């Protein structure tokens, strides 16, 4: 038995070392675009296989392969669109989707980028691994040289900052996820209205707490409930908890990172050089989410102002409509705040988007299409750091995939046209549900990796097919599309995720 155990341990160690060597070779020799594409496709396929192998909780439900592949892609690209009823899935399938959202999140990929960059610096740093020469000196010279300690140069500080950032980002993710899950679980345990919803739906409280926290922090948007957060529209405390988690993983991440670094410097948990250098020279560190102090303050102020204006506009357009039916004034404001924050990143909805005023839907669509201020600031900082001469060299040496890639506007226009072609029969027979606006809204939501959807309503059908009853299905509008239409939307989700990642990867590669 010990011999077999030794053989197993040796084989496992050899497999891990081989995998590490392969990953390092891929990371150091392939372009970032191909690395990201390969990563998303591999995780997507593995998630699809896991979802197919695991059986749903509803034994009468037999999911189609296209729906499982769509769901896996939606989780990996942190989009949040669903073509199946989430409550039909088993707890193990929900756990797989939660893991996929975490592995595909911007935060985790940024963490991997820091780890690879730190490994690359150690690999190309021969000074730390060998002595170039040995000089023989006299005893008097040696005694004079002993008390002298050379100071760290800029390269050493940057290398040390990368290692320090790996620890900071890892600790940040663990703290937010663990604390967020515990707070959500405690809220559900003490508030009967929220607890009764999960009991009625037979959803495990611990699994829901972890899943909703990961979904909010990673901006994934997939929740174990069919109605997303709409069933908790009256629970102000839960919505406010998730608002904080969404902001901590998206637009206010640069501010929270600087606060964590500032707190660690105050607690003296590291040398003074690393936190001071990162706080004063954040652009030199090369981490896209660590912005200079002035830009971080401006980002937080603009985000607060933008969310505030969105809440005011949303309330003015929908205050007395069916969107807020049965809610108090405080609950209406809380739901408007949740939608203003979620429509920018997470895609979790606490209200029925099909009932929202058209002007507010147009605003949501613009918010989903435009990149966040964090990405814009990162791109501007990247342009200043690279310079025009490097831009000319980069443009001349662009890979073929980048040269031939569609612009976002051209790509989305093409996708909308293709979807209109594949769904032309439904457009002619069911024009209210399959309206051009609803199709555009769904495509923009997929491209922006948000996940908001207008859904489908049987009450809007103009023609009822004989012998076929229409049943309300609480999932995304794309769940009613044909298989070619779903595959086209899968491409839109992947393209949007790659376009978003490629635009912010320059500083971390």
Swiss-Prot record:
The chain crosses the membrane at residues 33-53, 96-116, 165-185, 237-257, 297-317, 353-373, 401-421, 476-496. Keywords: Cell membrane, Ion transport, Membrane, Transmembrane, Transmembrane helix, Transport. It is a multi-pass membrane protein. Its main location: membrane. Disulfide bonds: none annotated. It is found in: Cell membrane. The keyword Chloroplast does not apply. GO terms for biological process: potassium ion transmembrane transport. It catalyses: K(+)(in) = K(+)(out); Mg(2+)(in) = Mg(2+)(out); Ca(2+)(in) = Ca(2+)(out). The keyword Cell membrane applies. Residues 1-32, 117-164, 258-296, 374-400, 497-509 are cytoplasmic. GO terms for cellular component: plasma membrane. Expressed in spikelets, leaf blades, leaf sheaths, internodes, nodes, the base of stems and roots. PANTHER family: CATION TRANSPORTER HKT2_3-RELATED (PTHR31064:SF11), POTASSIUM TRANSPORT PROTEIN DDB_G0292412-RELATED (PTHR31064). Belongs to the TrkH potassium transport family. HKT (TC 2.A.38.3) subfamily. HKT transporters are proposed to contain 4 pore-forming regions enclosed by transmembrane segments with each containing a potassium channel-like selectivity filter motif. High-affinity potassium transporter that does not show potassium-sodium cotransport. Potassium transport seems to be independent of sodium. Mediates transport of the divalent cations magnesium and calcium in the absence of competing potassium ions. Selectivity for potassium is dominant over divalent cations, and magnesium and calcium transport may be small and may depend on competing potassium concentrations. This is Cation transporter HKT2;4. It comes from Oryza sativa subsp. japonica (Rice).
């Amino acid at each position: 038995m010990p011999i077999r155990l030794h053989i197993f341990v040796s084989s496992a160690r050899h497999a891990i070392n081989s995998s590490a060597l392969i990953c390092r070779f891929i990371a150091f020799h392939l372009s970032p675009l191909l690395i990201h594409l390969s990563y998303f496709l591999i995780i997507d396929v593995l998630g699809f296989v896991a979802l197919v192998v695991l059986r749903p909780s509803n034994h009468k439900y037999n999911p189609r392969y296209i729906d499982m592949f769509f769901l896996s892609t939606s989780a990996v690209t942190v989009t949040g669109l669903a073509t199946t009823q989430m409550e039909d899935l088993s707890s193990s399938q929900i756990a797989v989707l939660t893991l996929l959202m975490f592995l595909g999140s911007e935060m985790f990929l940024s963490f991997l980028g820091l780890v690879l960059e730190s490994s690359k610096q150690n690999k190309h740093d021969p000074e730390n691994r060998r002595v170039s020469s040995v000089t023989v000196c006299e005893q008097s010279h040696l005694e004079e040289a002993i008390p002298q300690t050379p100071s760290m140069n800029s390269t050493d500080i940057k290398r040390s900052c990368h290692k320090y950032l790996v620890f900071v980002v890892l600790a940040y993710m663990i703290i937010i996820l663990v604390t967020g899950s515990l707070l959500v679980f405690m809220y559900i345990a003490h508030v009967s209205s929220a607890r009764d919803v999960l009991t009625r739906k037979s959803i495990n409280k611990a699994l829901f707490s972890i899943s909703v926290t990961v979904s909010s922090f990673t901006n994934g948007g997939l929740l174990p409930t069919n109605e997303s957060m709409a069933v908790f529209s009256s629970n102000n405390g839960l919505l406010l908890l998730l608002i904080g988690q969404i902001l901590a993983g998206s637009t206010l991440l640069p501010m929270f990172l600087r606060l964590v670094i500032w707190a660690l410097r105050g607690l003296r948990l590291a040398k003074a050089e690393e936190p001071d250098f990162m706080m004063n020279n954040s652009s030199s560190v090369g981490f896209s989410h660590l912005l200079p102090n002035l830009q971080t303050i401006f980002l937080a102020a603009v985000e607060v102002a933008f969310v505030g204006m969105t809440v005011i506009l949303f309330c003015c357009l929908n205050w007395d409509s069916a969107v807020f039916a049965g809610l108090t004034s405080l609950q209406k404001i809380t739901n408007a705040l949740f939608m203003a924050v979620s429509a920018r990143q997470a895609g979790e909805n606490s209200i029925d988007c099909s009932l929202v005023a058209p002007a507010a839907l147009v605003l949501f669509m613009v918010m989903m299409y435009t990149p966040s201020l964090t990405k814009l600031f990162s791109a501007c900082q990247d342009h200043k750091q690279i310079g025009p001469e490097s831009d000319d060299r980069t443009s001349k040496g662009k890979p073929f995939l980048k040269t031939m890639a569609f612009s976002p506007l051209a790509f989305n226009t093409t996708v909308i046209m293709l979807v209109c072609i594949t769904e032309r029969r439904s457009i002619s027979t069911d024009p209210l549900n399959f309206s051009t606006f609803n199709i555009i809204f769904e495509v923009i939501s997929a491209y922006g990796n948000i996940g908001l959807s207008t859904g489908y309503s049987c009450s809007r059908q103009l023609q009822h097919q004989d012998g076929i009853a229409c049943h309300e299905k609480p999932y995304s509008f794309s769940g009613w599309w044909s298989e070619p239409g779903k595959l086209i939307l899968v491409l839109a989700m992947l393209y949007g995720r790659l376009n978003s990642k490629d635009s912010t990867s320059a500083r971390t590669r």
